[in-house]
UniProtKB/Swiss-Prot annotation:
Belongs to the cytomegalovirus US12 family. The lineage of its organism: Viruses, Duplodnaviria, Heunggongvirae, Peploviricota, Herviviricetes. It is a multi-pass membrane protein. It is found in: Host membrane. It comes from the Viruses. Keywords: Host membrane, Membrane, Transmembrane, Transmembrane helix. This is Membrane protein US21.
Length: 243
């Protein structure tokens, strides 16, 4: 078999396995949502009131990640996708956690994101000599100042609309420019980051389920238990990532 045929088979197997992972993930997510809908419907009514805040936080994250991609065009694509996935999910969970005053969820999420981002960046910094250049720091500082000016000078509704438009623009541009490149540059080894995406999503799903649990005085103990479980799970996944 020619090399081109082997590459096509590898791509097909990779896509098949990733879609299987996504399908399992969706089944788990729908099962949990159905359970919460049947058992705790009043919690879902509270969740709808925080949708606008969550979307605003997501769009701010997308703008920041778009800036990262512009400032560091040579940054590894699979690392960028993992960081995008991690940051967007964590911002949504944390924003809702603040809305519901679930401190244990927020503490667990901060620990999870910190550990995962550290492992992701450290692996590539030491193994592939990825260097974050000065343009990233300059661009990030400029973006922070612009966001501060937008939220200070404009009313709340206007600033949210501007952030949403900027986030959507980044999404559309990224999809149009990168879809063909991603399809042609798929490697079978990228299955490991895909599996890690599923692992992270299941962990975030576990943290999100804590929203539907009643607040108790022992929330500090719950936070310590969740953080400890997060540390152990992340440490167990790190050898797979490095390999």
């Amino acid at each position: 078999m020619s090399l081109r045929g082997q590459v096509q088979i590898a791509r097909s197997v990779f896509l098949l396995r990733i879609y299987i992972l996504i399908w399992v993930q969706c089944l788990i997510l729908m099962s949990v949502c159905a359970f919460c809908w049947l058992v705790l419907p009043h919690r879902l009514e509270q969740l709808f009131s925080s949708v606008r805040l969550t979307l605003s936080c997501l769009m701010i994250s997308i703008v920041c990640l778009g800036l990262l991609r512009w400032a560091e065009p040579n940054f590894p694509k699979n690392v960028w996708i993992l960081l995008t996935y991690t940051l967007l999910t964590s911002v949504a969970v944390t924003a809702s956690g603040f809305h519901f005053s679930h401190r244990s969820v927020i503490y667990a999420m901060v620990a999870t994101v910190t550990l995962f981002c550290f492992l992701t960046l450290a692996t590539y910094l030491f193994a592939r000599d990825v260097e974050l250049q000065r343009s990233l720091l300059t661009g990030a500082s400029t973006l922070i100042l612009l966001l501060f000016a937008v939220f200070s000078l404009f009313p709340e509704a206007v600033s949210e609309i501007l952030v949403m438009i900027a986030g959507l623009a980044v999404i559309v541009t990224s999809v149009v420019c990168d879809t063909q490149d991603i399809l042609h540059d798929i490697e079978y080894e990228s299955y490991i980051p895909g599996a890690l995406c599923l692992y992270m999503d299941l962990m975030y799903l576990f943290v999100s389920v804590l929203y539907f649990m009643p607040s108790e005085p022992g929330s500090a103990h719950t936070a310590q238990t969740t953080v400890a479980a997060t540390v152990a799970a992340t440490a167990a996944a790190s050898p797979q990532f490095v390999s």
